[in-house]
UniProtKB/Swiss-Prot annotation:
It comes from the Eukaryota. SUPFAM superfamilies: Family A G protein-coupled receptor-like. Disulfide bonds join 95-187. The gene is OR51B5. Coiled coil: none annotated. Keywords: Cell membrane, Disulfide bond, G-protein coupled receptor, Membrane, Olfaction, Receptor, Sensory transduction, Transducer, Transmembrane, Transmembrane helix. Residues 1-23, 74-97, 159-194, 257-271 are extracellular. GO terms for cellular component: membrane; plasma membrane. It is a multi-pass membrane protein. Residues 45-52, 119-137, 216-235, 293-312 are cytoplasmic. One of its GO terms (biological process) is sensory perception of smell. Gene3D superfamilies: Rhodopsin 7-helix transmembrane proteins (1.20.1070.10). Odorant receptor. This is Olfactory receptor 51B5.
Length: 312
């Protein structure tokens, strides 16, 4: 029996074969969800309250934290509903909207990491022009450009989902909706919907990563030319947090993309693990990495707690 995507709900299975353990698995996801909300929420609060953090680098970091919050809020309530409450049905419109926000926020995060690499490149390779290049107006324009690219680029493959017919099954072997999983259920010509995301992965994820890599090659070249050992170390430290975030994000997202596209022989549980690794690890690790590796963030945390302690 076929039905249009706009009228028929989908059924989410969570972890097929592990239904008896769903409640225990949900405890882990709940802990991770709370940690992501707390970490990124705290980071946003610090950047808002501490005027020393009102700089381009931390503006982009605030965008990164907001994106990670958005990704968690988009996926985790559905995951917990499936695993904890056994609420497996999701309306088609909600499913397609979830797929849209998951993929658009992913491309948005890639753009933010690219903008942060540009910030570090200017700060280290051309420090005398930093304030003239990264003016408030230009930083806002970069931020808006990244937002537009992320949210507009995903519209073409998502919009047709509302009009496709879905036959045989409306079951998704997951706890949330991904475009590549939904499209497999459509009984229509989905060539465009399969090719377009692959092109996006190359021209956004891969290209962004290559530009970031090249920028850090140039940064390293500049750092090695600094005579003072102390200044070299100081310059490198300012990049460590960003490099860690870049590695965590691109390893998980490109790994997930490759498995979905070429991993037909890979066990389904591996697909699930890679999906959850992407949705959990970058949002969890980004605030931790910046809190541990960035002196300004550490000072802001101390200032925040000291101020509140004195106030009480």
């Amino acid at each position: 029996m076929s039905s249009s995507g706009s009228s028929h709900p989908f059924l989410l299975t969570g972890f097929p074969g592990l239904e008896e353990a769903h409640h225990w698995i949900s405890v882990f996801f709940l802990f991770m969800y709370i940690s992501i909300l707390f970490g990124n929420g705290t980071l946003l609060l610090l950047i808002k309250e501490d005027h020393n953090l009102h700089e381009p680098m931390y503006f982009f970091l605030a965008m990164l934290a907001a994106t990670d919050l958005g990704l968690a809020l988009t996926t985790m309530p559905t995951v917990l509903g499936v695993l904890w409450l056994d609420h497996r049905e999701i309306g088609s419109a909600a499913c397609f909207s979830q797929a849209y926000f998951i993929h658009s926020l992913s491309f948005l995060e890639s753009g933010i990491l690219l903008a942060m690499a540009y910030d570090r490149f200017i700060a280290i390779c051309n420090p005398l022009r930093y304030t003239s290049v990264l003016t408030n107006t230009r930083v806002v324009k970069i931020g808006l450009g990244v937002l537009m690219r992320g949210f507009v680029s995903v519209v073409p493959p998502i919009r047709p989902l509302y009009f496709f017919l879905y036959c045989h099954s409306h079951v998704l072997s997951h706890a949330f909706c991904l475009h590549q999983d939904v499209i497999k259920l459509a009984c229509a010509d989905t060539t465009f919907n399969r090719l377009y995301p692959a092109v996006l992965v190359v021209f956004i994820f891969v290209l962004d990563y290559l530009i970031i890599f090249i920028s850090y090659v140039l940064i390293l070249k500049t750092v090695l030319s600094i005579a003072s050992r102390e200044e070299r170390a100081k310059a490198l430290i300012t990049c460590v947090s960003h490099i860690c975030c870049v590695l965590v994000f691109y390893v998980t997202v490109i790994g997930l993309s490759l498995i979905h596209r070429f991993g037909k022989q890979v066990p389904h549980i591996v697909h699930l693990i890679m999906s959850y690794a992407y949705f959990l690890f970058p949002p969890l690790m980004n605030p931790i990495t910046y809190s541990v590796k960035t002196k300004q963030i550490q000072n802001a945390i101390l200032h925040l707690f000291t101020t509140h302690r004195i106030g009480t």
